Amino acid sequence: MPHAPYDERLDALLRVAAQVFARKGYHATTMRDLSRASGMSLAGMYHYVPGKEDLLYLIQRRCFQSVLHDVQEAIANVTDPIERLRTFVRRHLEFFAANMNEMKVLSHEADSLTGEHAREILDLKRRYAQLLQRTIAGANGRHPSVAAYALFGMMNWIYTWYRPDGVLGPTELADTIAELFVHGVRGGTA
């Protein structure tokens, strides 16, 4: 049975697994690869998780739960609808700028989970997408569902080109993307 979510060794294992999955891909990665990268024996790894899919599931669950909680908390007391949308974008991008390997794994391995793992992650993703759709609708955005997925498209591929130590810090990146999106979603012109 996996340890509590805040177990330091499990947390370290999940970080290493995200790095290896991001570099090699989930399907090309073996438990031996993860053992070597983590410095943990295979027996030690199996003490934490029954198998590789469980690691992928825990990475995805932890990310979606964390970002969902963080965004909900951040927008809870923001009354201005446009500022709520900006806050959503800011928190989403700041979270994933700090977790680029996890972002890549979430983007590339979305269909690699099976059974109950897949259902639970799909439910978390649905809840997160609905939160963004409601946020966009509150800002008088047109077609909230389409707009939400377009915004996720803008935000979720930053791992392919964004460097946190580059010209824009995570907050500046988030503010830039939020402005681009807000002007488009409200029908503004550039």
Model regions: which residues?
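N-terminal intrinsically disordered/low-complexity leader segments
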Residues: 1-8, 15, 19, 189-190
